[in-house]
Amino acid sequence: MERPGLVLQDLPPEILINIFSHLDEKDLFTLQELSTHFRNLIHDEELWKNLFKSRVHTTHFPTFSQSSKFSVEYIERTRGLHHWQHNKAIRTKYTIIPTRNWDQPSIERIVFDYPRVAAYNDGTITILQLQNHKRQKKFKKLIYIPCTTPQGCSTMDFNINAAVFGRFDGRVFGKLLSNKSYLTPVMEFTGRHSAGVTAICNSESWDTSREDWSVSGSENGEIIWWCENKLVKMWKVSNRVIWKLAFFKDWTLIMDDEKLYIIHQMQELHSIDIPKDLDEQPMRVRFFKMDFGSMTLVLADLNNVYTISVNPNGNFGNLRKLEMPEQICAVEIDEKTSQREQNWQFAGDDGCYISLLTTQNTLYIINIRDLSSSGLKVQCKISFDEQVYVSQVTNLIVVVALPNVLQILNAMTGELIKTVLKTEKFPEFLKVSQDKIIMGSGNVLNYLKFVSSDSKKHHHSTKGKNTVSNKWNETLNTELQYYDEDEDLRRKRQSEISRLIDAYGGDLELSGDTDEENDIQLRIALLESQEAQARNQAEAGEPVGDDEDEQLRRALEESQLIYETQTNSSANHGNNTNDEIDEDDEEFLRAIRQSRVEDERRRHLRNHTTGRRNGPLSDDNFATYGAAESSERTSTENTIGSSVGVDASNNVDEDLQLAIALSLSEIN
């Protein structure tokens, strides 16, 4: 058994390193205990460099440990991925309600720099503090800052420090968030452009100790640098419309229709042409991302992505291109890495990832700082079966928001690390900062914090019974969400009832039983049909038969029976009817009695008239002239009285039927 070990040790170091590079980290730590020779080989950085080659097929990648050793980088990356994979996600929901209106405005932009979240919607900026300040008794997690958008606003930009606005008349407005000036209204800057503002941006530096800087561009090629709200310098760099701006520390990047302008410290000006398409026309830029760490600009249209070196002290103007087989619909960049200066001493050359999302729900990861090839090279390709709404890339992971699912993947290999269920159905926002995630849609934000099981056990042991389990929190949040939906529905119903009362003097009760409502509607429809039929027959001169009278009589008896049943039931439950209800009931009974009297009278008159018209003639009717004249006068009076009675009874019938319908609806 010792001879194979001796033979393995006698192999050349290059072969042993190649063999060991296919082993796992645990196996390597076991091997180093076998012999001093193995220990020396395992501590050799060339072995760990080969580990990256065998697993991710490259030695160019963003640094995670910010170390020059591949061994440290490999171990730290493994630990970071283990953290995302095994830690439990604790979700907290925040609803942004800046006003008391029923229809809350949706969030337009969001910035996440842990522990602060800044959300912007029209008229309000919301600052969310995710860290609890236990020493402050009146600490508020949500701070609503009024920020009315100026009229005639043509463009705006928003970050954690300020919100700036440009108008069509050349004026610039802003509100600072880094100090107590956020309590003041939106202020106008001391200066203006000679034409409409077409582009504006804040400095991408999130250092709150620095002054707040911004830059704006106009449609006639003017550039103005602002410090706080004061004009620092104006420079007309072009005669064309300024479409895009990027500003970070001493560097300002400007793009018009044809050229890119790079300005250093508001003095040195360098320019370069925009890449041209197949027709030798400047490309139509749809996506614009800037990596200030390597001074590399990313431009993309629907089918191609370009990287241009804009470093005047380096490989200025170097252009690389990647043609995509599918149409591009979104481009994201690792923002934190792009704002840190590239350090070539770090393991992997301190790369920077971008992600390209296509219309076929395919995600491409590219290291734009990888200069090992003449063109851009795809690090990994990830395909999804469901629609990808939004994604975010960092130096370690890629986070993808699908319907009701959040997936976390290894940015190097595309391997799925973790899946978080029951998230947003239609996510609109997704940000990652310091191993924490903010996602949301509409005016709702979900904060995901990943904690280890050990810390959770310690948390439970320290707080004991006062600690509420995460499952209970999720159940409570779900029930609160259902309660909010019910409350919104109730408010809408109440608003509709109030509108009907104001408009028609009545309301429509929407919360009743559906079967009872249908029954009432059918009865009302029956009464209306009977009324229409009786009216048509009366207009045609046809006598209304006894069937209609019998139906009306049965309807009256049924109404009275229902009323008596309801009255008896109410009496059995406590006799709590008041005087006003008794008066209404007595009035209703009087109406029924009066209708019966009118009905009997109308039937008697009708039968008398019909019998006189169709009955056999008798000699007694013509005994004397005086008797005939008296009979004729009596007949005329009866005829007139009958016609008047019929008209009156018709009016009474209409009122009676309407009263019956209303009484049925009240009883039911």
Swiss-Prot record:
Gene Ontology CC terms: cytoplasm; nucleus; SCF ubiquitin ligase complex
Pathway: Protein modification; protein ubiquitination
Coiled-coil boundaries: none
One GO BP annotation of this record: ubiquitin-dependent protein catabolic process
Modified residues (Phosphothreonine): 514
GO molecular function, one term: protein-macromolecule adaptor activity
F-box domain residues: 5-51
Biased composition (Polar residues): 564-578
Pfam family, one: F-box-like
Function, in words: Substrate recognition component of a SCF (SKP1-CUL1-F-box protein) E3 ubiquitin-protein ligase complex which mediates the ubiquitination and subsequent proteasomal degradation of target proteins. Probably recognizes and binds to phosphorylated target proteins.
Record's protein name: Ubiquitin ligase complex F-box protein UFO1
Organism of derivation: Saccharomyces cerevisiae (strain ATCC 204508 / S288c)
